[in-house]
A protein has these predicted regions:
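N-terminal secretory signal peptides that target proteins for export/translocation
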Residues: 1-11
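Bacterial N-terminal signal peptides
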Residues: 14-27
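Von Willebrand factor
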Residues: 36-100, 103-104, 111-156, 182-193, ...
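VWA/integrin I-like adhesion module and closely mimicked acidic/polar interface patches used
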Residues: 74, 159-200
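Short beta-strand-loop
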Residues: 79-116, 193-199
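Exposed acidic/Ser/Thr-rich ligand/metal-binding surfaces
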Residues: 125-176, 227, 246
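Von Willebrand factor A/integrin I-like adhesion domains
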Residues: 189-236
Length: 246
């Protein structure tokens, strides 16, 4: 990381102990030698007040279509299947599961997960509590139905945190438990958001960030991001400097 935009909240490293205590109920069990699935994936989608109805639909439909895409399904089948859950997040107490844990291993189960996403209704809007979103995603991983070789949180958003615990503290605590956090930064309103996500949000083994200029690019980006996460490698997607996509 070449530079930082600075911390969004007053330095409070002493508070990390308290945050670790808060995370204790969400402790992630290390993956067993004989994992039942290649990956347990939580998709954490921003629905804060900066995301309008059209942008909300672009995100949800983009994810649904990705799980109906033949390339994504082929990748999932090649690793023996994944467990996936999608949640929405905005303010401190506003995180909601849209599509609960689903074992996706073929086209039929991919379509079933897509149907759950399309059946969901917007749960909230509000401020941008990235730290609380990561806490909720960590709690969801604790309840994953199968042992997984990798545990990944894929968080997407269009703004910096403006309330709640510092994202980097929550990230560090989750990374210490073996959870990788990847990001998709939407630069429509904050062109520097990629730097913030790189410094404050993503982390862990093989972590990467993909950035797009606007919500119209989301569907293509999430498909490529899923392919990278499923195969446990970062794609070169056109201009991919810490994850840039034109």
């Amino acid at each position: 990381m070449l530079f930082s935009l600075g911390k969004i909240m007053p330095p409070a490293r002493a508070g990390l102990v308290a945050l670790l205590t808060l995370l204790a109920p969400f402790a992630i069990i290390p993956p067993a030698a004989a994992a039942k699935v290649a990956m347990a994936l939580v998709l954490a989608v921003d629905v804060s007040e900066s995301v309008d109805a059209g942008e909300y639909e672009l995100q949800h439909e983009g994810i649904a279509r990705a799980f109906e895409n033949a390339d994504v399904i082929d990748a999932i089948q090649s690793v023996g299947g994944i467990d996936v859950l999608m949640l929405e997040w905005s303010d401190r107490d506003k995180q909601a599961i849209v599509a609960d844990w689903t074992k996706v291993g073929d086209g039929a189960t991919g379509k079933a997960f897509a149907a759950k996403i399309r059946a969901g209704k917007r749960s909230s809007n509000g401020l941008t509590a990235i730290g609380d979103a990561l806490l909720a995603a960590g709690a969801a991983l604790e309840n994953a139905p199968d042992e997984a070789a990798r545990r990944v949180i894929d968080i997407s958003g269009d703004g910096m945190a403006n309330i709640g615990p510092r994202p980097d503290d929550i990230r560090d605590a989750l990374n210490a438990k073996g959870v990788t956090i990847n990001g998709l930064a939407i630069l429509a309103s904050e062109p520097w958001l990629d730097t913030y996500y790189n410094n404050e949000v993503i982390g862990g083994d093989g972590a990467f960030l993909l950035q797009v200029k606007d919500f119209d690019s989301f569907a293509t980006a999430i498909k490529q991001k899923l392919l990278a996460e499923i195969s446990a490698r970062s794609f070169l997607l056109g201009r991919f400097a810490a994850g840039q996509m034109q």
